[in-house]
């Protein structure tokens, strides 16, 4: 059980709909004025831990923490004792004596919850096998910029997003939960055998009941109709390269190409968390075309994560 006296961001539904909107509003402010916020009067040191390699996560957190006047202490799994005898509970207790926050990109979601049992500083999920909630905040910021610049996060309600490809991965899970939190209708369009696990569908639908959103899982490409946002991800997620499963043939009909985009709304935008493989999950004509917002999306990792850290540090209990 996580420490009830600390607010963490381990999953998309750790923020209420109102809290998510606060983070997105702050992210927009920090994008306009990168030095607008300093969350602490004293020192700000953040442990940034990597069990999985990264480009965007590493650079965006390092730069963002520096913008906030802090210092990132970056440690990979090969240069610490984590997972080599010392319990994660002990590690969480010890790191909390040194830093003001912990950011961790790891494998099992349980790693985060184990550390959160004893950590007395906020922990941020920078990606697990189950979820990638920081990416969803960046995506939502990008959608607000393009589809609701005047209304802000409130204008996301009723917008429709569709995700095509591998529905049984961390991105699909977080899209369902995070977008439902924002009040967006979200459809996962994936072949049989590659659809989301029911536990994540249920979590997303529970949140959708609060916000009036819908969560749809289907293998039918007709579901693209009416989409304001079209999304995909790599067909072979990190760590699945040698699992013996054919991760190409089943997904070929679900490539996001010009024909798929033509089914969506005329002004629909395209998102991809990157890295992308042109000619596989997305055609070059789409990702390099006028609907693509993938580089704005990547930039917004910086702003959304800064906003999240500020919000967590300013909204701890007590």
Curated annotation (Swiss-Prot):
Please provide, in alphabetical order, the Gene Ontology terms of the cellular component aspect for this entry. Answer: cytoplasm
User: Sorted alphabetically, which Pfam families does this protein's record hold?
Assistant: OTCace, OTCace_N
Entry binding sites for L-ornithine: 170, 233, 237-238
- Where does it live in the cell? Cytoplasm
Which pathway does UniProt place it in? Answer: Amino-acid biosynthesis; L-arginine biosynthesis; L-arginine from L-ornithine and carbamoyl phosphate: step 1/3
The catalytic activity of this protein is classed by the Enzyme Commission as: 2.1.3.3
| GO annotation terms (biological process) | arginine biosynthetic process via ornithine; citrulline biosynthetic process; L-arginine biosynthetic process
Alphabetical UniProt keywords: Amino-acid biosynthesis, Arginine biosynthesis, Cytoplasm, Transferase
- Reactions catalysed according to its record: carbamoyl phosphate + L-ornithine = L-citrulline + phosphate + H(+)
Q: Which GO terms describe its molecular function?
A: amino acid binding; ornithine carbamoyltransferase activity
Q: Which residues are listed for carbamoyl phosphate binding in this entry?
A: 54-57, 81, 105, 132-135, 273-274, 301
Q: Extract the InterPro entries matched here.
A: Asp/Orn_carbamoyltranf_P-bd, Asp/Orn_carbamoylTrfase, Asp/Orn_carbamoylTrfase_sf, Asp_carbamoyltransf_Asp/Orn-bd, Orn/put_carbamltrans, OTCase_ArgI
- Top EC class for this record: transferase
What function is annotated for this protein? Answer: Reversibly catalyzes the transfer of the carbamoyl group from carbamoyl phosphate (CP) to the N(epsilon) atom of ornithine (ORN) to produce L-citrulline.
Q: Which family does it belong to?
A: Belongs to the aspartate/ornithine carbamoyltransferase superfamily. OTCase family.
What PANTHER family does the record point to? ORNITHINE CARBAMOYLTRANSFERASE, MITOCHONDRIAL, ORNITHINE TRANSCARBAMYLASE, MITOCHONDRIAL
Q: What is this protein called?
A: Ornithine carbamoyltransferase
Q: Which gene carries the instructions for this protein?
A: argF
């Amino acid at each position: 059980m996580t420490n009830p006296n600390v607010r963490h961001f381990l999953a998309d539904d750790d923020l209420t709909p109102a809290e998510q909107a606060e983070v997105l509003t702050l992210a927009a402010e920090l994008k306009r004025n990168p030095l607008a916020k300093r969350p602490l009067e004293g020192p700000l040191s953040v442990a940034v831990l990597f069990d999985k390699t990264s480009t965007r996560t590493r650079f965006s957190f390092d730069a963002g923490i520096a913008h906030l006047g802090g210092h990132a202490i970056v440690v990979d799994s090969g240069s610490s004792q984590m997972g080599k005898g010392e319990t994660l509970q002990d590690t969480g207790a010890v790191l909390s004596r040194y830093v003001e926050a912990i950011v961790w990109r790891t494998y099992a979601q349980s790693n985060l919850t184990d550390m959160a049992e004893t950590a007395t500083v906020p922990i941020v999920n920078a990606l697990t096998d189950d979820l990638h909630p920081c990416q969803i905040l960046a995506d939502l910021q990008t959608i607000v910029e393009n589809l609701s610049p005047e209304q802000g996060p409130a204008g996301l309600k009723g917008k429709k997003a569709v995700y095509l490809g591998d529905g049984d991965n961390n991105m699909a899970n977080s899209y369902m939960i995070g977008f439902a939190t924002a009040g967006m209708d979200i459809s996962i369009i994936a072949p049989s055998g590659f659809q989301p696990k029911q536990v994540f569908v249920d979590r997303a639908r529970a949140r959708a009941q609060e916000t009036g959103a819908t969560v749809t899982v289907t293998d039918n490409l007709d579901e693209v109709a009416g989409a304001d946002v079209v999304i995909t991800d790599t067909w072979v997620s990190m760590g699945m390269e040698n699992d013996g499963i054919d991760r190409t043939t089943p997904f070929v009909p679900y490539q996001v190409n010009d024909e798929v985009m033509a089914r969506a709304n005329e002004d629909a935008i395209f998102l991809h968390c990157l890295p992308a493989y042109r000619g596989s999950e997305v055609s070059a004509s789409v990702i390099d075309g006028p609907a693509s917002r993938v580089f704005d999306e990547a930039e917004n990792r910086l702003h959304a994560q800064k906003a999240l850290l500020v919000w967590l540090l300013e909204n701890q209990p007590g």
